[in-house]
């Protein structure tokens, strides 16, 4: 069931859709994922006359509007023309999966069709519409995190995701630095590994990681490193540091769940156990509510 590939930077994993009853660790404030701060721009009017995409009416002006908007949001592999091809439909499906908080490009509403006035149209017009981008690298002492996927693994390409995930990583890094690392400067930084492929979609290395809404975190050691080949059973595993890292992520409003098998941290409410998560944690986010112009339905 698990797909494994031997590699120098750690074991990849399958993160399935496991329901989680959220428990807040003691002292951690309650969050509301629907009101999370995200990067925004003015709401955009996208006056579609009909549907665009798979099986749509695909009027030329409508197609042009949708593709220009997707390109502006970072789906830059699309061509700015009026063609509806498989790349366009896949980009629409990826956008739909993201806005529904899915970890795979599948599920209800992921049909590759933008209906005028529908949910996908509404999200395209939203000021906080998801932007697709290269994940932040970090690595500086003030960042609190290091993205080894971007900085070190030049032969790998799981470097991409949503602006929402990028914000979550950088904010968690800042929180970890000020809340823990400043008092324990010899501790490892949060070490980020895989997010998603450059155009999202399925990857042979993961069951999820398709929508830029999750990333992996390496297990820290007591020597201040996180080389990627450490498990929670290793005598050098640093539980206190991992607790601080997971706490920083859980404090972020869009974080939906964290998968990691340390039974102590599971009992404390920082994470949920799932097979395959002894050697890394898997952090998932969900989507905020769309922010649209006043008067829009």
Please report, for each region that a protein language model flagged, where it lies by residue:
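Cationic, amphipathic, low-complexity alpha-helical segments enriched
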Residues: 1-24, 28
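Acidic, Ser/Thr/Pro/Gly-enriched interdomain connector segments
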Residues: 27-82
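Acidic/histidine-rich, surface-exposed loop or edge segments in extracytoplasmic proteins
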Residues: 41-52, 73-74, 132-160, 221-231
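Acidic helix-start/capping segments at beta-turn-to-alpha-helix junctions
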Residues: 83-91, 113-121, 185-204, 261-268
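Extracellular LysM carbohydrate-binding repeats and other cell-envelope/extracellular binding modules
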Residues: 86, 90, 94, 98-131
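Active-site acidic/histidine clusters and adjacent loop/turn architecture
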Residues: 130-192, 241-248, 255
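Short, surface-exposed glycine/acidic/tryptophan-bearing loops
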Residues: 203-223
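Catalytic cores and adjacent binding grooves of peptidoglycan-active enzymes
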Residues: 219, 224-297
């Amino acid at each position: 069931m698990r797909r494994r590939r031997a590699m120098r930077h750690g074991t990849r994993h399958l993160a399935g859709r496991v329901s989680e009853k959220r428990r807040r660790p003691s002292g951690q404030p309650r969050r509301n994922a629907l009101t999370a701060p995200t990067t925004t721009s003015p709401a955009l009017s996208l006056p579609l006359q009909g549907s665009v995409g798979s099986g749509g009416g695909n009027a030329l002006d409508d197609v042009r509007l949708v593709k220009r908007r997707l390109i502006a949001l970072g789906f830059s592999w699309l061509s700015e023309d009026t063609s509806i091809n498989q790349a366009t439909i896949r980009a629409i499906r990826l956008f739909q999966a993201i806005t529904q908080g899915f970890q795979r490009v599948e599920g209800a509403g992921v049909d590759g069709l933008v209906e005028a006035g529908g949910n996908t149209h509404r999200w395209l017009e939203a000021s906080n519409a998801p932007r697709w981008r290269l994940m932040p690298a970090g690595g500086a002492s003030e960042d609190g995190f290091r993205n080894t996927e971007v900085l070190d693994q030049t032969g790998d390409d799981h470097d991409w995701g949503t602006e929402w995930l990028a914000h979550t990583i950088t904010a968690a890094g800042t929180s970890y630095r000020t809340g823990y690392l400043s008092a324990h400067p010899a501790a490892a930084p949060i070490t980020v590994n895989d997010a998603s492929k450059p155009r999202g979609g399925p990857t042979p290395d993961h069951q999820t990681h398709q929508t830029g809404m999750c990333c992996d975190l390496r297990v820290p050691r007591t020597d201040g490193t996180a080389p990627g080949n450490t498990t929670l059973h290793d005598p050098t595993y640093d539980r206190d540091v991992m607790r601080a890292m997971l706490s920083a992520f859980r404090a972020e409003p869009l974080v939906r769940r964290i998968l990691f098998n340390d039974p102590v941290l599971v009992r404390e409410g920082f994470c949920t156990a799932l097979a395959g998560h002894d050697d890394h944690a898997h952090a998932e986010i969900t989507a905020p509510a769309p922010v649209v112009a006043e008067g829009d339905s």
